[in-house]
Amino acid sequence: MGGRGAYSYSSGSRKRSSSAPLNAYAVASLNRGIAKGTSTEAAIGRFREQLMDAKVEYSAYIDDAGYVHALGSTGKEGSTKVAPISAVAKQRDVSTVIHNHPHGGSDGRKWGGPFSEADLAYIASAHGATGGRVNRIVATSNEGTYSARVKRSVSGGQVRSAAKRADAAVSGKKYQSELAMWRAVNSAYASEFGKIGIEITFTEQKKKRSRLVTQKTGTY
């Protein structure tokens, strides 16, 4: 995934590594509190809160019961590592891929921003590879949560054409702010991808943070 640089306020292309290990504690942290009950939307909320200020992208799968599986990251800005679908083959009802869109990194962006063509190509491919079982991709950001759901089989060519039309609708225009630009981009992508069977929605949300636990502590 990744590839959101087409409209970014770029101040450089260097990549910075994260020292946070991805281990059982990190996955358990994202599933914290599930004994009281959970859901897919609750899992999305936990993921957003715990990775709100991460400078690199993390990805995971969520099942329909609200459990997070297979957390992954390259630890570098501008790229994402998604575990292969085979990593969750034994998990029942895994239907959602989730990742965060960072802000405040070396690219200068203040907001996470919407889906890229690469994000949407990934979920279209995953939908086809799983016979429709994996059908949703979510991107969390400091401005809110983006969701894209594949309603029918979509080819790579259709994705590229839809992205090209959406990009043409917004490129070269001036915007009053970075956030206004991202809203316009999301609107264009939602319009064009809706025509080929990928439904894109956005829910604006306030910042809400909690800590991702990556190592054992005295109270964990």
Q: For each predicted feature, which ranges?
A:
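Structured interaction and signal-relay segments at domain junctions
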Residues: H69-K81
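Short beta-strand scaffold segments in enzyme catalytic cores
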Residues: E57-D64, I137-T140
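A short catalytic or substrate-binding loop motif that flags glycine-/basic-rich loops and adjacent residues
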Residues: L51-K55
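Extended interaction regions within the primary functional domain
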Residues: G37-E41, A70-G72, Y146-A148
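Charged, amphipathic alpha-helical segments
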Residues: N31-E49, G113-Y122
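Active-site-proximal loop/helix of nucleotide/amide-processing enzymes and allied scaffolds
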Residues: G2-L30, T80-Y220
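ATP-dependent kinase catalytic cores of phosphoinositide-metabolizing enzymes
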Residues: V27, V56-E57
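Short glycine-rich, polar/acidic loop-and-turn segments at beta strand-coil junctions
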Residues: A65, T74-G75, H99-H101
